[in-house]
Swiss-Prot record:
In the embryo, expression is prominent in a subset of the cells of the developing CNS, dynamic stripes of epidermal cells, lymph glands and intestinal tract including the proventriculus and foregut. In the larva, expression was seen in the fusion cells of the trachea, fat body, imaginal tissues, and with abundance in the proliferating parts of the nerve cord, optic lobes of the brain and imaginal disks. Expressed in the salivary glands. GO terms for cellular component: chromatin; nuclear envelope; nuclear lumen; nuclear membrane; nuclear pore; nucleoplasm. GO terms for biological process: antimicrobial humoral response; mRNA export from nucleus; negative regulation of protein export from nucleus; protein import into nucleus; ribosomal large subunit export from nucleus; ribosomal small subunit export from nucleus. Keywords: Chromosome, Coiled coil, Immunity, Membrane, mRNA transport, Nuclear pore complex, Nucleus, Phosphoprotein, Protein transport, Translocation, Transport. The modification Phosphothreonine is found at residue 231. Residues 542-594 form a coiled coil. The gene is mbo. It comes from Drosophila melanogaster. Pfam families: Nup88. This is Nuclear pore complex protein Nup88. It is a peripheral membrane protein. It comes from the Eukaryota.
Length: 702
C-alpha cells in the first residue's frame, strides 16, 4: 500500500478512466465530491458522472468498481465544479458558462449503490437559465452553493459576475438578488472591474433574528419596493410569527464585505455594507480577494483568502449601532446601514509552492479555494495550483471554552495562533508548468481526503479527526508536578522539541506532468539543500549547543552535589559519634539515678523506723512487711524449683510414653476381635449383676 494512496485509488478503473479524459487547461477546479460513502467524479471526455462506494470498496472482494450516471440532456458546458446537495439527492455541475442539476436515483442493494449497482444509469438533468448565458457571452458563474437549510434539499444559489445571486428550486428560477451595482460590458461601467466592485464569492452565515428598523429606513425601503412593484407581495408575506433571516456574506474583489439579509425563500432582501473591518489596514485586508468561507462558530468565523496566499481569520459580530456607509457606485442599488462588524484576529500566509531561495522567486499568485471540514469545525482546507494546505483555527476552541465557562473570573485569551500545514505540494521549481488540483473530496468515518491532480495522479490520505484527541505524554500530570515545573523551568525534552520544530512544512511532492529538466532538478536540489541547511543542520547546531550547556550545568551540579554529599557524610559521622557518647552518658546517668532512688528509699525507711515518736503498730507493720517479703522470696524460690521438677517429670513422662508406643504389642485381628467380644460379654454380665444387686438392696432396704 502506497503512503500517498492509502485507498489505492490509482489502481481503480474509475480513475483510470478519469485519467484518460482530464481537461487540457491546468487550472484549479473541483471535479470530485463526496457525500456519505459515495465518491463522485466528473468525466470530462464523456460528459458523465462516475460514482464509487469508497467505503465498501475497502473490502477484499469488490463486485462493482463504479457506476456511470449519464445525463438525460447534453451537457455542453465545461464543468469545473461538482457539488452534491446536503441530503445527496441532487448534484450541481457548474462551469464558467452555466449550471446543470442532475437528479440522483434511489439507492438499494448490499453495497448501497444506485439501483442495486446497475453499471450505467440515465439520470434526469436540466440546465439553469441556458438562454441567459447564450445571450450574454460575458456572463460567468463565480460561485455555487446549496442552501444549508432548504427543506426540499433543492435550493441552489448561483453567484454571477454581474453582481447577482440567482436562487433556483430544482429547475425553476425563484428569485434574483442584487448584491452590487449592475455590470455592463460597455461604457463607463467597465470601471467596476478596475475598482474591484465585482462579487467574487459568498457564503451563508447562521440564522439571525431581524432587527427593528428605524422609521426613516423603513420609509426608504417602501419607496424602493414600490419601484420594484413588490409592495403587495411584501404586505401579504408579513406573518405574525417570528421571521428568521439568513445573512449572506458577499465578498468583493477589493476586499469589501457586504451582507445580504434574506430568508430561505423570500423576495425581500436587505443589502448592507460595506461592513466595517477592524483593525483598519491600508490594503483593506485584501486587494486581490478571491474566496470567502464561514465557519458556523459562535460568533461566526469568516475566512478571507487572497490570491497572494494570505488568509485572514475574522469574527462576524453584531454592531452596537448601525453604521452608515458611503454611497454606492450605482444609485439604483439601495444599501442599508450595516448591522454587523468584522474583526480580524490573525493573518496566515501560505507557501504557494516550493522554490529555491537562490532564484529569489516566490510561488506567485493563484486563486485559492476553500473547503470546510465537516468533522472538525476548527479545520478547513485551502487548495490551489501549488497544492493543498490544512489550516487549523485555534481561537475557535478558546471562544467555545470561554462561552461554556461558568466562572466570572475566566478571561478570554486568544494567544494560540492558527497553524497551516502544507500537505501536498505540486510546484517545486521556478518553471511556469502547473500541476493543478483538479478535485478535492473529504471522506468521513474514517476521515480522509482524496485529491485528483492535473497529472492524473490520485492522492488519498488519512486524517486525524482532531489533534487535541491525541494523547500526549504531557497530559494527566499531577498537580504537584506543576509547582515543581514552575520552579525548575520547562523540561529539557520540551526545549529540544521546540528547537527542532521547523518553521516550514515538508509536504508531499506530487509527480510532474513530464520528467523534470536538468535546470528543474538543480533547483529542486538547491531547495532541498537550503531546507536541510536552514531547517535541519542549523537547528541541530542549536540543539548541540543546548546539549553542551545542559551537560555543563549537569556537571557543575554534579560536582556541587558530590561536595555536599561529602560534607553531609562528615556531618553524619560527627552526629553518630555524638549520639553514641550521649547514649552512653544517658545510660550512666539512668543507672546512677536508679541507685540514688534506691538509696533514698532505704534512707526514708530507716528514718521512719528510727523516729522516736513511731507507734508500735507501724513498727509491727514494717516487721510484718519484712517477714512477708522473706516468705514471698522463699515461696518464689520454691515455686521455681517446683516448675523445674514439673518440667523434668513431664519430659520423663513423654519419653516413657514414646517408649511404650515403640514397645507396644499388637494382637492379631482375630484375637483382638475375640477379646473384644469376651469383654463385651463380661461388661453385659457385670451390668446385669449390678442391676440385680441394686434390686436386692432395694428389697432389703439397704
Amino acid at each position: 500500500m502506497s503512503l500517498t494512496d492509502v485507498l489505492e485509488l490509482n489502481k481503480t478503473e474509475l480513475f483510470a478512466k478519469i485519467r484518460n479524459g482530464l481537461p487540457v487547461v491546468q487550472r484549479t477546479q473541483n471535479l470530485l465530491d463526496c457525500k456519505d460513502d459515495l465518491l463522485f467524479a466528473w468525466h470530462a471526455k464523456d460528459s458523465c458522472l462516475l460514482v464509487r462506494n469508497w467505503r465498501s470498496s475497502l473490502a477484499a472482494k469488490v463486485n462493482i468498481q463504479f457506476q456511470t450516471l449519464i445525463p438525460s440532456s447534453l451537457v455542453s458546458l465545461e464543468v469545473d465544479r461538482v457539488l452534491a446537495s446536503n441530503e445527496g439527492s441532487l448534484v450541481a455541475l457548474s462551469g464558467p458558462r452555466g449550471v446543470v442539476i442532475m437528479e440522483l436515483p434511489r439507492r438499494w442493494g448490499p453495497d448501497g449503490y444506485y439501483k442495486d449497482g446497475k453499471p450505467v444509469i440515465t439520470c434526469r438533468t436540466f440546465g439553469l437559465d441556458t438562454q441567459l448565458f447564450l445571450k450574454n457571452p460575458h456572463l460567468e458563474v463565480r460561485q455555487v452553493r446549496w442552501h444549508p437549510h432548504s427543506v426540499s434539499d433543492s435550493t441552489l444559489l448561483v453567484l454571477l459576475n454581474n453582481n447577482t445571486i440567482r436562487v433556483y428550486n430544482h429547475s425553476k428560477l425563484r428569485h434574483v438578488w442584487q448584491v452590487g451595482p449592475p455590470v455592463l460590458r460597455s461604457g463607463a461601467n467597465n470601471s467596476l472591474c478596475d475598482f474591484g466592485e465585482l462579487a467574487v464569492d459568498f457564503d451563508i452565515a447562521p440564522a439571525a433574528k431581524p432587527r427593528v428598523t428605524e422609521p426613516e429606513t423603513a420609509g426608504n425601503n417602501e419607496t424602493t419596493l414600490d419601484k420594484s412593484n413588490k409592495t403587495l407581495v411584501a404586505a401579504k408575506s408579513l406573518p405574525k410569527q417570528e421571521r428568521i433571516e439568513w445573512p449572506m456574506v458577499v465578498l468583493r474583489e477589493n476586499g469589501n464585505i457586504y451582507i445580504l439579509m434574506t430568508g430561505v425563500d423570500s423576495e425581500n432582501t436587505r443589502l448592507q455594507g460595506p461592513v466595517t473591518i477592524t483593525p483598519q489596514a491600508h490594503d483593506n485586508y485584501g486587494l486581490e480577494s478571491c474566496a470567502l468561507m464561514i465557519i458556523p462558530s459562535l460568533p461566526p468565523t469568516i475566512v478571507i483568502a487572497e490570491s497572494n496566499g494570505k488568509l485572514h481569520h475574522a469574527l462576524l459580530m453584531e454592531a452596537e449601532a448601525t453604521e452608515h456607509s458611503f454611497n454606492e457606485v450605482d444609485d439604483s442599488v439601495l444599501i442599508e446601514p450595516a448591522e454587523y462588524v468584522v474583526h480580524v484576529l490573525e493573518t496566515v500566509e501560505l507557501e504557494l509552492g516550493i522554490s529555491a531561495p537562490a532564484t529569489g522567486k516566490e510561488g506567485g499568485n493563484c486563486p485559492i479555494y476553500l473547503k470546510r471540514d465537516l468533522i472538525n469545525e476548527l479545520r478547513y482546507f485551502a487548495y490551489h495550483n501549488a497544492g493543498l494546505h490544512a489550516v487549523t483555527v485555534s481561537f475557535i476552541a478558546e471562544l467555545q471554552r470561554y462561552l461554556e465557562s461558568e466562572s466570572d473570573e475566566d478571561r478570554l485569551e486568544l494567544a494560540v495562533s492558527a497553524s497551516a500545514e502544507y500537505i501536498l505540494c505540486t510546484k517545486f521549481d521556478s518553471s511556469e508548468t502547473v500541476n493543478a488540483v483538479f478535485g478535492l473530496a473529504l471522506l468521513q468515518i474514517p476521515a480522509g481526503i482524496v485529491l485528483l491532480l492535473g497529472s492524473g495522479q490520485v492522492i488519498s490520505l488519512k486524517l486525524v479527526i482532531d489533534a487535541q484527541l491525541l494523547v500526549t505524554p504531557n497530559e494527566n500530570k499531577p498537580v504537584d508536578s506543576e509547582v515543581s515545573q514552575q520552579e525548575s523551568g520547562p523540561p529539557f525534552v520540551d526545549t529540544i522539541k521546540s528547537l527542532l520544530q521547523r518553521s516550514v512544512n515538508q509536504p508531499i511532492l506530487a509527480d510532474k506532468l513530464s520528467s523534470p529538466s536538468a535546470q528543474e532538478s538543480f533547483e529542486l536540489l538547491n531547495q532541498a539543500i537550503e531546507v536541510l541547511r536552514e531547517q535541519y543542520l542549523k537547528r541541530h547546531d542549536l540543539v548541540r549547543a543546548a546539549f553542551t550547556r545542559h551537560i555543563n550545568q549537569i556537571q557543575l551540579k554534579k560536582e556541587q552535589q558530590l561536595q555536599e554529599i561529602q560534607d553531609l557524610e562528615q556531618e553524619r559521622e560527627l552526629i553518630s559519634e555524638r549520639a553514641h557518647k550521649l547514649a552512653e552518658r544517658f545510660e550512666e546517668i539512668s543507672y546512677n539515678q536508679e541507685l540514688l532512688v534506691r538509696k533514698c528509699n532505704a534512707l526514708m525507711q530507716r528514718a521512719n523506723a528510727s523516729l522516736p515518736n513511731s507507734v508500735i503498730a507501724e513498727r509491727e507493720f514494717s516487721q510484718e512487711v519484712i517477714r512477708l517479703n522473706k516468705v514471698t522470696q522463699s515461696l518464689a524460690a520454691g515455686l521455681e524449683t517446683a516448675k523445674k521438677t514439673f518440667n523434668k517429670q513431664r519430659y520423663h513422662i513423654a519419653q516413657s510414653q514414646e517408649d511404650l508406643k515403640k514397645n507396644a504389642y499388637e494382637l492379631p485381628e482375630k484375637q483382638h476381635r475375640t477379646i473384644t467380644e469376651i469383654l463385651t460379654q463380661l461388661t453385659g454380665e457385670i451390668d446385669r449383676q449390678i442391676t440385680d444387686v441394686k434390686r436386692i438392696n432395694k428389697i432389703v432396704g439397704i
